[in-house]
């Protein structure tokens, strides 16, 4: 059998496996070293107890006639969809427009399958690698990078962006930590309207936004229902990185050029290749959105943002230019004129800290590293202490 030629389009060394390889090589040469990881964005704190109990009860319930359930509705249980509509969208969206998923990453792959390969896409640069890599796997070849740098306040100059079918946009952004303002999102929606493009809006980190003036959803912007869909995630919201739960919102008004409903096609695709998110995970999601659950996850998010502030302060004292960490769990650190992998290696060898090279997120990420706020407080404090003990290393 012939290999799928689209796989040959991918970088042979995906960003995070390459980081893990370098970690292993360093530890093999320095077995006594204590590495602190501020690289991959995985949550570290326990799932709040009320939510964990709901997960356990749902699991145990499967062992009884009364509690057993098999396949659920592909769109997700109605209770959870109603809760998401009410708690996250305040009535802007209806439960019928919400689809429960097994996480945003898997959902992005299915969305890429939905739109196929005979399309053009625009992607923030830097951005989460899945937008580009997943598109390449589908066979998409027309990819436009939209530079988002400190010089343009991490928002692309749309006057320089050609018309594309899809626009991937993540706010707050991974990796830069930048959260788009209302004015910026209004420009984005207007641009999509003028070009008959569809925005895939990734809101995975929306619940880290603390500035009340910054929208948490693209659907807070007038006109977005006609040009956008949105993905959401419980991973960073509630520590569900291992549980796997998310959602996608597709408005009734979102149509293709021929007037066909995007939502109808999405329902058909997911009904064909997806049996729905785990019943256990969805029970946990309902617990997250209960009053107690929301209070508990808000405290967890506050904990991570405090950690971001600790690391940011240490980096600034060293003399670095640092972005993010206020409305997102990511810090974006600039090293003018340097290569990202060189900086990664210096942090690994000098501080015994694992970071993420900015170049792995796109051409405009060269000269940056990403650091995350995900870590136990004692390790965050140790990392900050190591940083404060040094001056500029580059």
Model-derived segments and their meaning:
Residues 19, 38, 55, 84, ...:
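Generic structural signal for small/hydrophobic residues in well-ordered secondary structure
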Residues 64-192, 206-221:
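Conserved core of the PLP fold type I
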Residues 282, 286, 301-312, 322-334, ...:
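Conserved glycine-rich beta-strand-loop-beta hairpin in the small C-terminal domain of fold type I
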Residues 46, 304-305, 318-350:
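Conserved PLP-binding catalytic core of the aspartate aminotransferase-like
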Residues 30, 138, 194-195, 318, ...:
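Helix C-cap/helix->beta junction micro-motif
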Residues 221-302, 309, 313, 391:
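Conserved core segment of the aminotransferase class I/II
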Residues 92, 346-355, 360-394:
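PLP-dependent enzyme catalytic core of the Aspartate aminotransferase-like
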Residues 2-103, 110, 288-291, 394:
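N-terminal small-domain helix-loop-helix segment of the aminotransferase-like
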